[in-house]
Amino acid sequence: MIEIIQEYWRALLWTDGYRFTGVAITLWLLILSVVMGGILALFLAIGRVSSNKFIRFPIWLFTYVFRGTPLYVQLLVFYSGMYTLEIVKGTELLNAFFRSGLNCTVLALTLNTCAYTTEIFAGAIRSVPHGEIEAARAYGFSSVKMYRCIILPSALRIALPAYSNEVILMLHSTALAFTATVPDLLKIARDINSATYQPFTAFGIAAVLYLIISYALISLFRKAEKRWLKHMKPSSTH
């Protein structure tokens, strides 16, 4: 094991000498997908709770499709399927985009987490105490101001525990990136196994690194929950 770590630690952590690899790529995939998917989900969640069915239905359909199909299949559709379409082949921008395994992986991860996060945020919006909304209306808040100052801040705090689980799941989902030949942590572990024929060591090292990242994320979310959800915990009585 020591020999493998000494030889491959750089590739496992950030580079093989030619490109970024390993943990660096895994974190990059996670950050890109979570940030872009989260921002998009925030707007879709507002539409998801809309009383207008023409706004609500397309968003429901989007979340149904991406939550109802495996992420692995979605990645294969983007990476292997899209490039076979004539419209993609004939459009320079689309051609260049779907030719990249990294682009396809980020797209699949972003849309997948967006679908789940939309439902998390929508559920949190529905859970905002009605009294807060009525008070905002009584003060003459417009719909935009009410969402910006009252509903979204409360909803995001309510959604934090469920959203933290989604982020951890997305970290695990980045392991599918090797399917698109993206040199993430699992891809490097597979390459080490192919070179050394020591699968327990190769994948064991990868597992330890995933655990370290997961622990760091869980710790960050716990600190956030203690800070922003403290007022929501019942006070102790003596």
What are these regions (language model features)?
Residues M1-H238:
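Transmembrane alpha-helices and adjacent helix-loop boundaries
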